[in-house]
């Protein structure tokens, strides 16, 4: 699920299908009905901005406690044999409200994180900064996934090695641009 999404275009079926929410539903074999969209992404905003800014443009805001409660309920409803992924929005320091960031949301949920990063120029700094920020809140990092960007200045393996050298024992997996995830990909 992706509880918060900005850049949402409710009136365009193609845009819905191409959105993160549409892609998540399609990957589960779920039709993008109003009910399915509400269940996956209840906090939707039109402007492609940080959620706090996008919500403000619509005269709205995100109720942080409601967001956390929604996610906790979904975790509770997930069976023992199921896996629930809660996709964030932007980076860990993206503002959700006037006082809360994605980092606060992650910390409040207390769930381990699968940090997905690109392989673009600057990703090493962004990744190390995100991990350091998570450490300040004692957030468990399950693994880092490097999703190969369209333009990677160096091979993803070099990026992974550099990140690993600075973080120590981090689990890092690489997903190549062609989408062929490693057969042994386990988190």
Describe the predicted segments one by one.
Residues 2, 114-117, 142-148:
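Short internal beta-strands
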Residues 50-96, 103:
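Phosphate-binding/switch loop-helix module in NTP-utilizing enzymes
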Residues 4, 89-90, 120, 149, ...:
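Anionic group-transfer/hydrolysis microenvironments
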Residues 1-61, 73:
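N-terminal phosphate/diphosphate-binding loop that engages ATP/GTP or pyrophosphate donors
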Residues 20, 70, 102-105, 130, ...:
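A general structural detector for well-ordered alpha-helical segments in enzyme core domains, enriched
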Residues 97-120:
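Inter-motif core of Ras-like GTPase G domains
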Residues 131-187:
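C-terminal lobe/tail of nucleotide-utilizing enzymes
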């Amino acid at each position: 699920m992706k509880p918060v999404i900005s850049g949402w275009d409710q009136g365009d079926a193609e845009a819905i299908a191409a959105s993160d929410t549409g892609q998540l539903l399609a990957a589960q074999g779920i039709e993008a009905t109003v009910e399915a969209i509400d269940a996956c992404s209840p906090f939707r905003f039109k402007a492609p901005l940080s959620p706090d800014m996008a919500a403000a443009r619509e005269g709205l805001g995100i109720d942080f406690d409601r967001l956390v409660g929604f996610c906790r309920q979904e975790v509770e409803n997930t069976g023992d044999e199921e896996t629930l992924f809660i996709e964030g929005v932007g980076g860990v320091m993206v503002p959700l409200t006037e006082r809360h960031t994605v980092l606060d949301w992650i910390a409040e949920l207390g769930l381990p994180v699968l940090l997905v990063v690109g392989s673009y120029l600057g990703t090493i700094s962004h990744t190390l900064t995100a991990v350091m920020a998570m450490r300040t809140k004692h957030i468990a990092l399950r693994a880092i996934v490097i999703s190969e960007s369209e333009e990677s200045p160096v091979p993803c393996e070099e990026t992974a090695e550099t990140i690993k050298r600075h973080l120590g024992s981090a689990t890092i997996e690489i997903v190549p641009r062609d989408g062929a995830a490693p057969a042994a990909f386990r988190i």
